[in-house]
């Protein structure tokens, strides 16, 4: 049974993937499921930029949202039955109906492939803090893409998963490590009529680990972006290029260079007014020899360090955080890089 594709979904579906609607009637949606399915997803937090790798470098953290999805063919062909249960982060803030980001993204992907949204029950145990620069929205988009992969007959190819999620998210620096794990360099190919994203994996040095300082304050990604200048001096750009190149070497081969490699000249200083306490903590940690940066759009602080220094870093981080002179409070947390990205376990 099929029905007309709503206009807003036709628009949202445009450009998701070059072959998104191949083989499907342009104005028809149909049921994707022949029987009910149930599966469990585990999606890691992420940290993007890593200092000089603005909108390019990102890594996955072993700190995960756990989601269970039950899907069944629609009982009512005119409207799906959708229910979302959220525990943990965002439990008192996130919608529990079809307006939830995961549901709207799944609906968007399915519509682009020619299918309607089936009946869905989503139970989310959220651990990733929201609006802290730790990839909570990328985790939601990853959940949506992998849910769609389970629902679409034949699934989504690895390339479709890369392009669809990156286009919905807008940039791949958080999304790619959430999907695939580890550390990644991602970029947008030039001279393409539609956004075309590419990525290359990096294997981090076995001694590299992470320490986070998670503040009680939140930060809008868009508000942080709005503070950036239209252009920067050529000298600053050149310095940043050298540090970004060095960071690839440091994080994979020579961790002793991480402090120099994480110097940023493109975004952090311009955003200082948005999270002064976080920047003060970054300054103190870097002054003590730790490779501290703002995680993503902030305000969380990330330190890339050798495992042997992680405990002392967390201790120092807690002491420095109490001395910033600001009202913000920070919770130190040591986390390894997640070598595995999002996982899916089919339950039936």
PLM regions with names:
Residues 13, 25, 29, 250-348:
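Glycine-rich, charge-dense phosphate/pyrophosphate-binding loop(s)
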Residues 29-31, 55-58, 166-168, 172-176, ...:
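A generic local secondary-structure boundary/capping motif
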Residues 188, 215, 303-307:
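Short beta-strand-to-loop capping motifs
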Residues 2-132, 154, 337-340, 347-348:
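ATP-binding N-lobe of GHMP and related small-molecule kinases
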Residues 63, 182, 214-219, 265-266, ...:
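Glycine-rich beta-alpha junction loops
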Residues 205-288:
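Acyltransferase
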Residues 9-21, 25, 116-196:
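Gly/Ser-rich oxyanion-binding loop with an adjacent helix/lid
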